[in-house]
Amino acid sequence: MSRIASTFSALKSQGRKALIPYVTAGFPFADITPELMHSMVAGGADVIELGVPFSDPSADGPVIQKAGEKALALGIGLAQVLEMVRVFRQKDGTTPVVLMGYANPVERYDIKHGGSATESAFIRDAAQAGVDGVLIVDYPPEECVEFAARLRAHNMDLIFLLAPTSTSARMAQVAEVASGYVYYVSLKGVTGAGTLDVDAVEAMLPRIRQHVKVPVGVGFGIRDAATAKAIGKVADAVVIGSKIIQLIENQPRDKVATVARDFLKEIRAALD
């Protein structure tokens, strides 16, 4: 059983929901990410999603795009992100870490670091670093069968996005290859946009669960404890990204970790 699966299993037995914060690796300071990850765990995070900066992030809203641009300007690429996970793992061997990003940096990493037709350098190095799951926004499920199998061989999960526009056929395709959890994007459009319609989310989840047997996390548009609590009543996990980025983007270095921790404590208290 993967670390993600055992985390969800433990939470389910306690009747609790997973809190999954997202931060862009290397933001707002190049070297702050491992410390920020530890502070989010202290605030109640069950799984951490780490965004891999990319120059053309089609699914990200302006807040996360801007964070990615800053991280890229600070020299953060996939190799640096894996090093951050290694550093985090020196003190935390239990909290699952998911890398969220796009196909291009993964493919470039494989070319640069000696991937072959039978082995992906990215998968090898991610497993060694202590990564638990991968969410590649622009990898369609029908093209991911082999990638998913290679990840599973290293005890890593392949996580997919589902949207309000996802058809039953698409959900069935995702169910074939997804493991760990699926991430339901509760708004049409890009991350951090608009307000959340909890009733619409609640109506959609039974449809998703007909097809998908892994836990369902809901994100995009969750900004406060009240919304998190409402979503937590219907979903297995609450994912929060843009709001955390906004809270930390203008903080002095010594305040970043505490601001993130204190915000997550509020969300955790509401979920529990």
UniProtKB/Swiss-Prot annotation:
Pathway it works in: Amino-acid biosynthesis; L-tryptophan biosynthesis; L-tryptophan from chorismate: step 5/5
Any GO MF annotation of the entry: tryptophan synthase activity
EC number: 4.2.1.20
Pfam families xref list: Trp_syntA
UniProt KW Amino-acid biosynthesis keyword: yes
Keyword terms of this UniProt record: Amino-acid biosynthesis, Aromatic amino acid biosynthesis, Lyase, Tryptophan biosynthesis
Residues annotated as the enzyme's active site: 49 (proton acceptor), 60 (proton acceptor)
GO annotations of cellular component type: cytosol
Reaction(s) catalysed by this chain's protein: (1S,2R)-1-C-(indol-3-yl)glycerol 3-phosphate + L-serine = D-glyceraldehyde 3-phosphate + L-tryptophan + H2O
CDD domains attached to this UniProt entry: Tryptophan_synthase_alpha (cd04724)
Metal-binding recorded as keyword: no
HAMAP family: Trp_synth_alpha
PANTHER family: TRYPTOPHAN SYNTHASE ALPHA CHAIN, CHLOROPLASTIC, TRYPTOPHAN SYNTHASE, ALPHA CHAIN
Family note: Belongs to the TrpA family.
Protein name as annotated: Tryptophan synthase alpha chain
Species of the source: Polaromonas sp. (strain JS666 / ATCC BAA-500)
Source taxonomy: Bacteria, Pseudomonadati, Pseudomonadota, Betaproteobacteria, Burkholderiales
Gene name in the database record: trpA
